[in-house]
């Protein structure tokens, strides 16, 4: 099993230093999305005291030419703190700081999708939009081979691995447990975890989160997963179809509701939202992965519990549909619906913004509407 060189360093020696007192100083790790729209970057600065709110955190900058975000001749980019969490790696009073990225002219960077998403969320805050996102991922060795798979072949076919227990069914649970506890410590709204259908594939759920919090919490949960995997010497990939062939892909099913949907006879509003979504399928497919639908085309085949990328469908308890209404929601006539189209590597800001635009702002057509400030 190929693991990284860093994971073989003596962690006991490191712990000697991590146990040293740090006085009144605080380490703040600033985290941002790079120019790929998928990768995360981070760097740390020292603060003189523990920040109590986001406003107490200073802006910072970085070299955008090294993160696919600018040219070397004008490479300074600004980091503007947006959300703060406890640091599960360095522990209290240290912080994780999720940032928006702005260019030299103070305009949002191309992959700063949070900026517009926040404006859209603020327009509908009175409707109390809630989201829950189910993040699937696959554990890989540093050689790009799925964790625990035979080096020269494949494990047994899918069937026993989903929510499986046992050394021959669950591959890499230590990482899952470490990530779960680290998220709870950080203050991430993590709802749960489970082993997925393909061996070495796992899922964690974030939510319910209201409005912009959905993207903040999911991105930082992804960062924590990458850092935990770094310590274990393996890689977490959000590729929506990491292994071609008769293996399940990886999605980020998104559950959505408004206050009206959650109240008595809310099913009426759920059905109205689904009707709007049915008329804007291609717009959503473009928003649901970083490559405008190309990544999802490998996953949304109509097989392996997915819908076909070219067709819109909806149904109660149907995991082969674009939109699934859970059976309990159909029975209680209120609740939420699940959009099964987003890919595992989607930007949650793009996904949640698209749902708000179509379902609550009643947008139509293939392009998002440009609202005046």
Curated annotation (Swiss-Prot):
Compartment annotation: Cytoplasm, Cytosol; Microsome; Mitochondrion; Cell membrane
Regulation (activators, inhibitors): Glutamine synthetase activity is inhibited by methionine sulfoximine (MSO).
Chief location category: cytoplasm
Modified positions (Phosphoserine) in chain numbering: 343
Origin organism lineage: Eukaryota, Metazoa, Chordata, Craniata, Vertebrata
Single GO MF descriptor: ATP binding
Binding-site residues for Mn(2+) 1, renumbered to this chain: 134, 253, 338
Binding site for ADP: 336-338
Record's catalysed reaction(s): L-glutamate + NH4(+) + ATP = L-glutamine + ADP + phosphate + H(+); L-cysteinyl-[protein] + hexadecanoyl-CoA = S-hexadecanoyl-L-cysteinyl-[protein] + CoA
Start and end residues of each GS beta-grasp domain: 26-106
Gene Ontology biological process terms from the UniProt entry: angiogenesis; glutamine biosynthetic process; intracellular ammonium homeostasis; positive regulation of erythrocyte differentiation; protein palmitoylation; regulation of endothelial cell migration; regulation of sprouting angiogenesis
A Pfam family per the record: Gln-synt_C
Residue sites binding ATP per the record: 134, 203-208, 255-257, 319, 324
The family this protein is said to belong to: Belongs to the glutamine synthetase family.
Disulfide bonds: none
InterPro entries per record: Gln_synt_N, Gln_synt_N_sf, Gln_synth/guanido_kin_cat_dom, Gln_synth_cat_dom, Gln_synth_gly_rich_site, Gln_synth_N_conserv_site, Glutamine_Synthetase
N6-acetyllysine found at: 11, 14
Positions annotated to bind L-glutamate: 246-247, 319, 340
Subunit structure and binding partners: Decamer; composed of two pentamers. Interacts with PALMD. Interacts with RHOJ. Interacts with BEST2; this interaction tethers a fraction of GLUL to the membrane, causing a decrease of cytosolic glutamine synthase (GS) activity and inhibits the chloride channel activity of BEST2 by affecting the gating at the aperture in the absence of intracellular glutamate.
Keyword Mitochondrion annotated: yes
Binding-site residues for Mn(2+) 2, renumbered to this chain: 136, 196, 203
Region annotation Required for glutamine-induced ubiquitination by CRL4(CRBN) and proteasomal degradation: where it falls in the sequence: 2-25
Keyword field: Acetylation, Angiogenesis, ATP-binding, Cell membrane, Cytoplasm, Endoplasmic reticulum, Ligase, Lipoprotein, Magnesium, Manganese, Membrane, Metal-binding, Microsome, Mitochondrion, Nucleotide-binding, Palmitate, Phosphoprotein, Transferase, Ubl conjugation
Gene Ontology cellular-component terms listed: cytoplasm; cytosol; endoplasmic reticulum; mitochondrion; plasma membrane
UniProt modified residues of type Phosphotyrosine: 104
Name of protein: Glutamine synthetase
